[in-house]
Amino acid sequence: MVRKRRTDAPSEGGEGSGSREAGPVSGGGRGSQRGGFQQGGGQHQGGRGYTPQPQQGGRGGRGYGQPPQQQQQYGGPQEYQGRGRGGPPHQGGRGGYGGGRGGGPSSGPPQRQSVPELHQATSPTYQAVSSQPTLSEVSPTQVPEPTVLAQQFEQLSVEQGAPSQAIQPIPSSSKAFKFPMRPGKGQSGKRCIVKANHFFAELPDKDLHHYDVTITPEVTSRGVNRAVMKQLVDNYRDSHLGSRLPAYDGRKSLYTAGPLPFNSKEFRINLLDEEVGAGGQRREREFKVVIKLVARADLHHLGMFLEGKQSDAPQEALQVLDIVLRELPTSRYIPVGRSFYSPDIGKKQSLGDGLESWRGFYQSIRPTQMGLSLNIDMSSTAFIEANPVIQFVCDLLNRDISSRPLSDADRVKIKKALRGVKVEVTHRGNMRRKYRISGLTAVATRELTFPVDERNTQKSVVEYFHETYGFRIQHTQLPCLQVGNSNRPNYLPMEVCKIVEGQRYSKRLNERQITALLKVTCQRPIDREKDILQTVQLNDYAKDNYAQEFGIKISTSLASVEARILPPPWLKYHESGREGTCLPQVGQWNMMNKKMINGGTVNNWICINFSRQVQDNLARTFCQELAQMCYVSGMAFNPEPVLPPVSARPEQVEKVLKTRYHDATSKLSQGKEIDLLIVILPDNNGSLYGDLKRICETELGIVSQCCLTKHVFKMSKQYMANVALKINVKVGGRNTVLVDALSRRIPLVSDRPTIIFGADVTHPHPGEDSSPSIAAVVASQDWPEITKYAGLVCAQAHRQELIQDLFKEWKDPQKGVVTGGMIKELLIAFRRSTGHKPLRIIFYRDGVSEGQFYQVLLYELDAIRKACASLEAGYQPPVTFVVVQKRHHTRLFAQNHNDRHSVDRSGNILPGTVVDSKICHPTEFDFYLCSHAGIQGTSRPAHYHVLWDENNFTADGLQSLTNNLCYTYARCTRSVSIVPPAYYAHLAAFRARFYMEPETSDSGSMASGSMARGGGMAGRSTRGPNVNAAVRPLPALKENVKRVMFYC
């Protein structure tokens, strides 16, 4: 997951204003479990019923954490005890896990509502989710014993409707799996036609043959393999290959349209090495190539699959066609994954630090409902500029390297950037030999000597170049490049080397480079469509010798696809605002005349300013304006801080945070806590953001809101309104709810208690070989509202895609076999916060590629089943498992870019556009949904693929649910591009990486963008989880932070 730039600014959204709630309230003892949420001087119609009449809500007292015994029973750490902070949504109390002690009539400002919290799970124990129990049997001063809680879970009534679906047994292997068939096509919404970047490919009627290729001596480079096979075809096509033009995958497989005149044959091929060896000579190498018939590639089954008469996709046949269509572009362009790049496809753009962006295109053959489809999209990536090495080093260090000696840090940076890079020498005229850099010399060139004879006579590199080549080295203070192996290294002065063109930069980009690359890739839909069509014309598949050889014909026009535009959902806000409900327009709305449905409380807050540009008086003004915006949006926000804003230097972040926190808490009366820390950051803040979040959330126990200097100076109302939304959910409030959820009108969600999960795994950046992956799982904790999400995060094995800690089982010396895990903890939390056990599970899983579908489903569905069974014998609620994919290359364009009724302001298709025909899977349950309005560039629809469905969703049911949930994202007044549970899981995992590796960031502003997944370009492992792998655990979150959505 590339990291986003680190700021805590919210996504862009609507403007916000409103007024504070006011009204009578009475309360005593414990709050009503099912009624409205009453606190302070206003009536918050929260909870499930949203009843108009005032409800009783007491001010809770001191809360208590779960005892150690309970923690061990359910996998939580023994230290899970602490002060309560906020009652559940259906209680009016301020209390702990056992509920607060009731007080008299409440007269103060509204107390903070609890919100499900995100926790950190470590193996083998977990920090259990903390939501207060709402069972009437629980004493307000005592939490239930583990056995009691388990009994309560079992005793929950299922009279609201037991699942009628038969629970399907999980197959033992992927071969037995059948993904759900499409339950018909959706009918809801306004019908329209869109264009997709899919091009119809006519299935060939040729006889395809598969041959195994063995090249000895074996090489790891596909480029060398291809060069060998090209030489073979050039030499022997007419004489030995029956005039066939084979397609080669660069490894072990060769395919032909029709048989070769032999079943097995050996060839000898001589090839001149492109690179110079350790002795300075280009070797001519002989390769033995054995080509042996393996099988015929059957296209009959592919035709049956495309017609829907066969459920399993014949992967080999698809692979053959993909290899055939990649042959010509592989010879013309530079292949990177499934994409091809060239300086001729588009204008190169500088990315800084010696890098530049190249334009290219993505190409992949796919089975669809319309038959075979060639998916083509534009792409860009970073290449190393083909400059002299001296110039590259100057660009990398951003200075003239002749002005002062290189520091140790400079040498490390240069070595890291140049290792593995191919260079050519320039001091020998037209003889441009190529070498690959293996390192830098430890000493300067002027100090470097080497033996020239058997008597170990030493000669300096400076002398050698002058005597041998007549070249006088100018930059003798610089180290030499080292090429060849460590046993027999060669030394090349930097100034005689030039970087060879066409080398992709695969290491991690810095913030400036990411910004520049995003700017290059950002294209308006009409421009992207034109470039895609131009690429198809440039590739000219009709004249592609390989396509002709195999009988593949590619259409030259974009596919026209039937689509529907789903209506936006009505949203519920607090009745005391002028507008109690809202219907979003084109995927967005604003907070004007509206108030948060449940405003949180900030009584005690402080501000720390780390920006030298922001003076104290400006910091005070900014905080006052922000407090006012929170107030008018529906929160109870004290306009005066506990202490005046203080300025500090970023390098003293830990000392300042702890000192200021101590000073502020000392000033408060006993039992009071700091509710919020407002932080002003420099625009370029390095690792400050990550350090600050780590200290606040794992050491001090305080939620924080970071604001960049540029926003402090602008002080725009829209920015303030968005920050208010984030602050509200961080302190336990809720911004809005779906009207259909309150009126129980969501199919297969509202009829019985339903829990919605979101899960994601973020991986380290390429090159970080030892850092763990971070898994996050969130789950809804309110029903029927489904807006609040608790979660768990854990570190797991490097690049492990399967979530290892979904279900855990281990032996305890006293208790014997103990079960725990993320799913179990979240199910228990749902039970505590709603009073119901989930009778239906919907699981949105982000970040899974098609090749991982079977492994992820087999492992994670099994973990869900085991977690449920560990809570109650026979407890198996029906599960729907949906993969959410954003890293695909399907783009949808309006049929007419000039029709204002079919595009949004950015020229993209309208939010709510759903496609489940033609370009979708021939038989399985999948769809593309563009749930958001575009801001800039071309919108990427999310692809949802149902891998398991025991709830028997209709197409309309799942599509509408997914689209409507996209309007409930807490951080902005816009619909978002992926379903919020998956989005929250990603945010949680991303935040947890700050705890794990705060020192690795070289730029701390976090901005929205496509680099959020952090290292997503590198491969992911689906090996079976190794529970014994040593993974450094995440530092524990503090109790005050656990109970709020601090990651928003």
Curated annotation (Swiss-Prot):
Q: Where is the composition biased (Polar residues)?
A: 120-143
* Binding-site positions, a divalent metal cation: D760, D846, H986
A molecular function annotated in GO for this UniProt entry is:
siRNA binding
Phosphoserine is found on S1001
The signal sequence is none
Where's the PAZ domain? Answer: 388-501
Q: Which GO terms describe its biological process?
A: adaxial/abaxial pattern specification; adventitious root development; auxin metabolic process; cell differentiation; defense response to virus; innate immune response; leaf morphogenesis; leaf proximal/distal pattern formation
**Ribonucleoprotein among keywords:** yes
A GO cellular component annotated for this chain's UniProt record is:
nucleus
Q: Where is the Piwi domain?
A: 676-997
Ranges of compositional bias, category Gly residues: 25-49, 83-106
Report the cofactors. Answer: Mg(2+); Mn(2+)
Tissue note? Widely expressed at low levels.
What does the sequence similarity comment in the record state about its family?
Answer: Belongs to the argonaute family. Ago subfamily.
- Name this protein carries in UniProt: Protein argonaute 1
- Per the UniProt entry, what species is this protein from, by scientific name? Arabidopsis thaliana
